[in-house]
Amino acid sequence: MELVVGRVAKSHGIKGEIVVEVRTDEPEDRFAVGAVLRGHKPREQTVNTYRVEAAREHSGRLLLRLEGVPDRTAADALRGTLFVIDSAELVPSDDPDEFYDHELEGLSVRLADGTELGAVIEVLHSAAGELLSIRRAGEQSGELLVPFVAAIVTSVSVADGVVVIDPPEGLLDPDFGESADGK
């Protein structure tokens, strides 16, 4: 399975640097000088290989210079490129409570009493923390967002394909978060 570890947001300066939106917990390893990156544009099958020539942080953003990208024009052509790895390249964690996003996607979600709720469709990362995006069983659209915290997500078994949640009252209500006047 292909996993995205970064995306080219835009070019930076005139010497061919690119700004990378990091989507990995290990940017210092994945984007180190000398690292070989595989990348492609969204919805394109052709995968290109790039070698990192220089890497630095600037104003909280990762800037890379890649071999064969000498100027702004070449860097602009990379805008939107997704840097990917194969999930088989990932080292399994020794921590039983640590998961890669792709391991959770597709798992069945049940309530503590065993009631089937739906399935994890995505793990969302926000400034406030991680959220499980859940598609309710029998529904084709819409999502339920559940904070991925120990107080609510009581157990995860990748081997059994199950996430068990014990949500606080009201979290699963369709109108949760709306005021009495519907706003």
Curated annotation (Swiss-Prot):
This is Ribosome maturation factor RimM. It is found in: Cytoplasm. One of its GO terms (molecular function) is ribosome binding. Residues 95-171 form the PRC barrel domain. The PRC barrel domain binds ribosomal protein uS19. Belongs to the RimM family. Transmembrane segments: none annotated. Binds ribosomal protein uS19. Pfam families: PRC_RimM, RimM. GO terms for cellular component: cytoplasm; ribosome. The lineage of its organism: Bacteria, Bacillati, Actinomycetota, Actinomycetes, Mycobacteriales. Its main location: cytoplasm. GO terms for biological process: ribosomal small subunit biogenesis; rRNA processing. An accessory protein needed during the final step in the assembly of 30S ribosomal subunit, possibly for assembly of the head region. Essential for efficient processing of 16S rRNA. May be needed both before and after RbfA during the maturation of 16S rRNA. It has affinity for free ribosomal 30S subunits but not for 70S ribosomes. Keywords: Chaperone, Cytoplasm, Ribosome biogenesis, rRNA processing.
